[in-house]
Amino acid sequence: MEHWGEPIPRTGQSWRQPLSTSGRGWLGSAPWRWLGPASWRWLGPASWRWLGSAPWWWLGTATWWWRLGSRWYPRSMEQTQ
């Protein structure tokens, strides 16, 4: 864990190889461990429901605000002119 404080290796220094191997191993393993069996429970039916509902809810609110804005904003622009 001592390589965390080191800068990104750009020169051929002595700590470059352990940093790159451990860093690559950590970067290679951690996301897959994070996306592994433990998070399949997180990516299970509950989150598929969330992934199915949240974007549509966001798009629904965005289109609702856009309709509200497009309905009232041009009317106010016509009044100002």
UniProtKB/Swiss-Prot annotation:
The keyword Mitochondrion applies. It is found in: Mitochondrion outer membrane. Residues 11-22 have a biased composition (Polar residues). The chain crosses the membrane at residues 50-66. The keyword Glycoprotein does not apply. GO terms for cellular component: mitochondrial outer membrane. Residues 1-22 are annotated as: Disordered. It is a single-pass membrane protein. Keywords: Membrane, Mitochondrion, Mitochondrion outer membrane, Transmembrane, Transmembrane helix. This protein is produced by a bicistronic gene which also produces the major prion protein/PRNP from an overlapping reading frame. The alternative prion protein and PRNP (AC P10279) have no apparent direct functional relation since a mutation that removes the start codon of the AltPrP has no apparent effect on the biology of PRNP. In mouse and hamster, the alternative initiation AUG codon is absent and is replaced by a GUG codon. This is Alternative prion protein. It comes from Bos taurus.
